[in-house]
């Protein structure tokens, strides 16, 4: 299904691919019946709201790989083509506000009926070679080009406003960083893992993969996912770690909860984040079944990745002897992580796993140092200042942040057997973090190594 508004006459298209001469004529009747069945009960208002929120968020965040300038040019041309106003689709707040007002009026039901219950223009394309008398015929389509009366130049853009400086403050036991911005709102929570043991970080990494499958006292896992899809653009819990630029190159590790959303839904974001992190049921029969299911799937996925990306796993494994960041990467996503998964699956003591998750949640969410990063407007910041102190994120006192550490093991020569039919031989040297060396390594991989090993050597 597609909607094309890049032409003077916008079109709504329903395309059935892979149809046969027998099934193609039944397509229009099937669409009519499906629409009739849907209109019998009406389009659910919560689904319409979720769709509108998702579309509005996409119009602000611009997902995908196209540069914002290219998208703005397309939107400006489309708005100018249909309405004479190039700026209409560049500022969509009024457009979506008017659509939200129509949610409870039945307007969307009437629109669906008008578009899809009317007799459609149906085209059935049957592949065939062109006939001789068609090869020299005039083209059925004549392309034209619209000309702008007043094309913009770089001079029309001006210098633009400089970004406002960020601010730091203490709020509800957390360090709040505000980065002034317009458009979508980004709210990230960073719980410090400096006081965690290596094994605890492994359990936390598993927990972030399992949370989506677990219920809360208020919602089932599926209901909570629907709520997140309705009110948030993106939301994700994960382990983040990196080597800092401070003296000694410390490794910083955080449990992160990231959300992107429309500013008016900030109250929903705080409520959903609190429920997802603090109230998820980590014990009981349903949770234990989810543990076994998710970990078994993860084990299978890793075994497939060993075959497809054995070189990457070998590089991580070898580099783990030289830096804490690499050691932690190996611990949560490398061969060590795979062995940890196998051990848990072999023991199958899911009650103990749930108890471990509960203890870690208490330790981190209520006591670890918390940094809240807020990208949004001043009005949004004022709203956050009111919401955060009364939420589950608030604590009277928290610990201080510190670097994550673990003891590095001495380098060893290792070999692993995988059923991939490809051998990987990896050599690793310790190297201080240096931009010039990174450039040299990239040049070698593109030039010398690629040519001499891949092309000349035939590897």
What is the predicted function of each stretch?
Residues 413-416, 428-442:
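Terminal end segments
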Residues 1, 161-202, 419-421, 451:
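Active-site-adjacent "gating/activation" loops or surface patches in catalytic cores
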Residues 1-160, 226-400, 456-459:
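Charge-rich, well-structured scaffold segments of protease-associated domains
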Residues 59-63, 409-424:
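Short, low-order "capping/linker" segments at domain edges
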Residues 405:
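Pyridoxal 5′-phosphate
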Residues 183-227, 273, 434-444, 453:
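Active/ligand-binding-proximal structured segments within catalytic/core domains
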Residues 10-18, 187-189, 209, 255-257, ...:
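Short, hydrophobic beta-strand segments
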């Amino acid at each position: 299904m597609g909607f094309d508004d890049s032409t003077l006459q916008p079109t709504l298209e329903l395309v059935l691919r892979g149809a046969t001469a027998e099934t193609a004529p039944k397509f229009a009747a099937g669409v009519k019946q499906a629409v009739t069945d849907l209109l019998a009960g009406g389009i659910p208002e919560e689904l319409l709201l979720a769709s509108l929120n998702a579309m509005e968020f996409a119009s602000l965040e611009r997902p995908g790989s196209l540069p914002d300038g290219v998208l703005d040019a397309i939107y400006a041309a489309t708005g100018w083509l249909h309405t004479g106003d190039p700026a209409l689709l560049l500022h969509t707040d009024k457009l979506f506000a008017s659509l939200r007002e129509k949610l409870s009026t039945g307007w969307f039901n009437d629109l669906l009926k008008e578009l899809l219950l009317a007799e459609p223009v149906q085209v059935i394309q049957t592949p065939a070679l062109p006939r001789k008398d068609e090869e020299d015929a005039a083209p059925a389509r004549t392309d034209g080009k619209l000309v702008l009366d007043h094309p913009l130049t770089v001079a029309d853009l001006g210098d633009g406003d400089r970004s406002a400086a960020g601010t730091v403050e203490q709020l509800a036991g957390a360090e709040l960083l505000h980065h002034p911005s317009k458009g979508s709102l980004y709210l990230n929570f960073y719980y410090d893992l400096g006081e965690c043991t290596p094994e605890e970080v492994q359990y936390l990494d598993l927990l972030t993969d399992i949370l989506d499958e677990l219920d809360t006292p208020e919602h089932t896992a599926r209901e909570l996912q629907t709520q997140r899809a309705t009110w948030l653009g993106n939301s994700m819990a994960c382990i983040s770690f990196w080597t800092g630029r401070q003296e000694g190159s410390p490794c910083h590790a955080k449990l992160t909860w990231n959300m992107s959303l429309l500013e008016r839904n900030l109250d929903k974001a705080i409520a959903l984040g609190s429920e997802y992190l603090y109230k998820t049921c980590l014990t009981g029969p349903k949770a234990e079944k989810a543990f076994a299911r998710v970990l078994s799937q993860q084990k299978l996925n890793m075994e497939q990745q060993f075959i497809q990306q054995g070189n990457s796993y070998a590089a991580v494994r070898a580099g783990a002897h030289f830096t804490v960041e690499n050691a932690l990467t190996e611990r949560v996503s490398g061969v060590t992580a795979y062995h940890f998964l196998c051990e848990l699956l072999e023991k199958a003591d899911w009650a103990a796993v749930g108890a471990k998750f509960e203890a870690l949640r208490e330790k981190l969410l209520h006591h670890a140092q918390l940094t809240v990063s807020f990208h949004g407007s001043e009005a949004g910041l004022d709203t956050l200042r009111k919401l955060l102190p009364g939420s589950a994120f608030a604590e009277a006192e928290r610990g201080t942040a510190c670097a994550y550490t673990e003891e590095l093991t001495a380098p060893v020569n290792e070999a692993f057997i995988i059923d991939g039919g490809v051998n990987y031989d990896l050599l690793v040297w310790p190297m201080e973090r240096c931009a010039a060396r990174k450039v040299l390594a990239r040049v070698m991989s593109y030039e010398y190594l690629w040519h001499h090993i891949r092309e000349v050597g035939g590897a």
